[in-house]
Curated annotation (Swiss-Prot):
HAMAP family: HemL_aminotrans_3 (MF_00375). It is an enzyme of class 5 (isomerase). The gene is hemL. It comes from Histophilus somni (strain 129Pt) (Haemophilus somnus). This is Glutamate-1-semialdehyde 2,1-aminomutase. One of its GO terms (cellular component) is cytoplasm. It catalyses: (S)-4-amino-5-oxopentanoate = 5-aminolevulinate. It comes from the Bacteria.
Length: 432
């Protein structure tokens, strides 16, 4: 029995399913999850010392790579002064100013502790500000696990084959309208049915929780226009895409301006952080300046703030945004080329530092329905063959992959060599 298997067995005795987030259990791909002991740069190391090229990056935050010296130095220096104060700090102002500088649609920002907390708070703010109850989201998009948003959700919920979760009251779910991602007509229909009831539209600008699905041309702009027409707020959930698709987020890449933005992952540099922000007029509706309540014991934690500041300052350096996109493109096109050589139907979507692979005979994957029609079994075989060779992909056919600035051309080349062998295995009788 491997060390990971022993640890997993032990974990299952005291942690539900042996993990603290469902997708980590490998239920989507089968087998035993790999237990990681340390990480550095583009690599993670399991408890037996095996090294993997990491394309999960802690599910997105590690955009600079693991254990980056600037972040580590900032965290250690800040920790010497204390771990948490429960008071305002200079560091939270500095990170807020940095976020407002990099994302022009954000005039004010409130720090929280997770992406789920950010989206939950933004939804409450939108409802309070508009004095409306209904919200509109998209099938296959995931915005955290708050009750209002865990309706036909993607991510781990999609992986486990549960379109919604038990424990979400119907009274909550009835206020959530679910439309088709990349189908603007479905949104128009919803607004026509509930013209004065929709508080907000919330969307992942790149749907990273049904793998990696890009918005069709004018989809995001169309949502903006509909929100303007019907008096609803437009929320772009950049927890995953923020500072990763582009330095100003996916909203800058696709040239669309939301009323509110939610952030997480990258802004913590690996520490637990979330944030939501937007127009000053709307944000001032939050307590203590407004009637909508939101609070948090560890919000604005100084160590997390220092990590976020260090991370964003590194990302601002000239050439980093372009290099991240270049590495992602090299990997994506390389995988597609190898699949073609092996006559394996494959669609590879990518943008900025995100990518997704779909085993499918379809020419493109632009919707939830197309995503769930892909060959999950073939992905699972590919995943394990890559894992054997020291390449760690997301353990689910419905999760995006993440590039980091620590990855090198040599890492991409090694990954493609492993993929060549994995594709060949898929063609062999033992994997057919």
């Amino acid at each position: 029995m491997t060390t990971s298997a022993t640890l997993f067995s032990r974990a299952q005795q005291v942690i539900p399913g042996g993990v603290n987030s469902p997708v980590r259990a490998f239920k989507g791909v089968g087998g035993t999850p790999v237990f990681i002991e340390k990480a550095n740069g583009a690599y993670i190391f399991d408890t037996e010392g095996k090294q993997y090229i990491d394309y999960v990056g802690s599910w997105g935050p590690m955009i600079l790579g693991h254990n980056h010296p600037s972040i580590l130095s900032a965290v250690l220096k800040t920790a010497e002064n204390g771990l948490s104060f429960g008071t305002p700090t200079p560091l939270e102002i500095e990170l807020a100013e940095l976020i407002c500088q990099l994302v022009p649609s954000i005039e004010m920002v409130r720090m929280v502790n997770s992406g789920t907390e950010a989206t939950m708070s933004a939804i409450r703010l939108a409802r309070g500000y508009t004095k409306r109850d209904k919200i509109l989201k998209f099938e296959g998009c995931y915005h955290g696990h708050s009750d209002s948003l865990l309706v036909k959700a993607g991510s781990g919920s999609l992986t486990l084959g549960q379109p919604s979760s038990p424990g979400v009251p119907e009274d909550f779910a009835k206020h959530t309208i679910t439309c088709e991602y990349n189908n603007l007509q479905s949104v128009k229909n919803a607004f026509e049915q509930y013209p004065d009831q929709i508080a907000c539209v919330i969307v992942e600008p790149v749907a990273g929780n049904m793998n990696c699905i890009l918005p069709k041309q004018d989809f995001l702009q169309g949502l903006r226009q509909l929100c303007n027409e019907y008096g609803s707020l437009f929320i772009i959930d950049e927890v995953m895409t923020g500072f990763r698709v582009a330095l100003g987020g996916a909203q800058s890449y696709y040239e669309v301006t939301p009323d509110l933005t939610t952030l997480g992952k990258v802004i913590g540099g690996g520490m637990p952080v979330g944030a939501f922000g937007g127009k000053k007029e709307i944000m001032q509706y939050i307590a203590p300046t407004g009637p909508v309540y939101q609070a948090g014991t560890l919000s604005g934690n100084p160590i997390a703030m220092s990590a976020g500041i260090a991370c964003l300052n590194e990302l601002k350096k000239e050439g980093n945004e372009q290099r991240l996109a270049m590495l992602t493109k090299k990997l994506a096109l390389g995988l597609k080329n190898l699949a073609n050589q092996h006559n394996i139907p494959l669609v590879v979507n990518y943008v900025g530092g995100m990518f997704g692979i779909f085993f499918t005979t379809q020419n493109e994957v632009t919707s939830y329905q197309q995503a769930i029609q892909c060959d999950v079994e073939k992905f699972n075989l590919f995943f394990h063959k890559m894992l054997e060779q020291g390449v760690y992909l997301a353990p689910s056919a419905f999760e995006a992959g993440f590039m980091s600035l620590a990855h090198t051309d040599a890492d991409i080349d090694r990954t493609l060599q492993a993929a060549d062998i994995a594709f060949a295995s898929l063609c062999s009788s033992s994997f057919s």
